[in-house]
Amino acid sequence: GIANRRHLDSVLQNEIKRMKRNNTSLSLLMLDVDFFKQYNDIYGHQEGDSCLKQLSNVLVQCTQRPADLAARYGGEEFILLLPEADNKGAHTVAELVMKHLTLQNIEHSSSTVAEHVTVSIGIATVQAADIDTAEDIIKIADERLYKAKSMGRNTISSH
């Protein structure tokens, strides 16, 4: 299944140490369900939970490499941790998530971007020298997620 926040925090700390030790890159995707509050208001919290479970399954399907990690970050926010993935690789995974979620075709009549549930994705790809802490990479991904939302949602922002 999908990891919780505590497990994510511990894996992320270790991956940052490993990245610095081996001088590799690390990509982190932050995802947020578009118009999720409206979804809950219309379809109810049980359907909201079901929607998040389906998204969780999509995220697990899209993280194929053994070191990749899909985690619930909080609310309707999720994180994909992709050790040693460059920006291009991270983008490929983000596009795969959006494609697989579209195929789930979860109805969302109050979305202004599509008739089904969509996500916005912020990507942070860093090298050892770029960050000091887990908070640093999360902050970058969060800023890019905010940018994806301000660009009209249902999109990916990586710089």
PLM ranges: what are they?
Residues 1-27, 37-60, 71-75, 79-80, ...:
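Conserved long alpha-helical elements within nucleotide-processing catalytic cores of c-di-GMP signaling
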Residues 87-95, 125-159:
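Catalytic-core segments of nucleotide cyclases and related cyclic-nucleotide turnover enzymes
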Residues 66:
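Hanks-type protein kinase catalytic core
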Residues 28, 109-110, 156-159:
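Short, hydrophobic secondary-structure boundary micro-motifs
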Residues 99-119:
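Catalytic core regions of nucleotide second-messenger enzymes
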